[in-house]
């Protein structure tokens, strides 16, 4: 399992002249957040680049676009979220990565201690079914061999140059479709995972999001979308794709015929 995008190393940005009453730690957190989730050309990293990246983030999260660090921005930056960037090359659906085979295999290679294995198996299958019932694509679980999608839990550094950061922060990350590591999804075992009925991170919600990436979807700025990058508590019983999610996945794969919907 590896990260979808490896960001280039770069020197820290100089702090903007107007600190706005925010602490140095908040400014550093903002710099790291923007570098990770709104990456820009390493050659242009300066105070002006900070403002441009901040405006991009504010626009994505539908905040007032000021280019200034404020309390609303800080609140968003402190929310648990997916580890993938919110930006990327805007390609037409015909040129975006997707699975060609109509049957995609997956394998769960490691589990969390927070939930019974049978519960994890069930929730992964449920998350995949949410997507497959809308498109002409089926998923088959395998227990041996090399699957299309590898799913697992890990802590800290786990061999992909993209370490998890402990409780909170980034919850999971995944690959877009492709050979080798393409499609892989993994989850931070330092989180407290739940099935939606108790305290903790709703695994179904996060798995549905990450497996959306495994199918080729990007982050959405619609708060109702399962592809929204930050995590919010959701009811597992009523959890479902938004109309925008369905539209996006069908643009990639087409519609599943009504007779084949599960």
Curated annotation (Swiss-Prot):
Motif (Cysteine switch): 80-87
Family matches, as PROSITE patterns: ZINC_PROTEASE
Entry note: cofactor: Binds 2 calcium ions per subunit. Binds 2 Zn(2+) ions per subunit.
Keyword Metal-binding part of the UniProt annotation: yes
Prodomain positions: 13-89
Gene Ontology cellular component annotations, sorted alphabetically: extracellular matrix; extracellular space
InterPro entries: M10A_MMP (IPR033739), MetalloPept_cat_dom_sf (IPR024079), Pept_M10_metallopeptidase (IPR001818), Pept_M10A (IPR021190), Peptidase_Metallo (IPR006026), Peptidoglycan-bd-like (IPR002477), PGBD-like_sf (IPR036365)
EC number: 3.4.24.23
Catalytic activity: Cleavage of 14-Ala-|-Leu-15 and 16-Tyr-|-Leu-17 in B chain of insulin. No action on collagen types I, II, IV, V. Cleaves gelatin chain alpha2(I) > alpha1(I)
One example of a Gene Ontology biological process annotation: extracellular matrix organization
Primary location class: secreted
Annotated catalytic residues: 210
Recorded GO MF terms: endopeptidase activity; metalloendopeptidase activity; zinc ion binding
UniProt-annotated binding residues for Zn(2+) 2: 82, 209, 213, 219
UniProt-listed Pfam families: Peptidase_M10 (PF00413), PG_binding_1 (PF01471)
UniProt signal peptide: 1-12
Protein residues bound to Ca(2+) 2: 165-166, 168, 170, 188, 191
Chain residues that bind Zn(2+) 1: 158, 160, 173, 186
Membership in a protein family: Belongs to the peptidase M10A family.
Domain remark from Swiss-Prot or TrEMBL: The conserved cysteine present in the cysteine-switch motif binds the catalytic zinc ion, thus inhibiting the enzyme. The dissociation of the cysteine from the zinc ion upon the activation-peptide release activates the enzyme.
Name of the protein this chain belongs to: Matrilysin
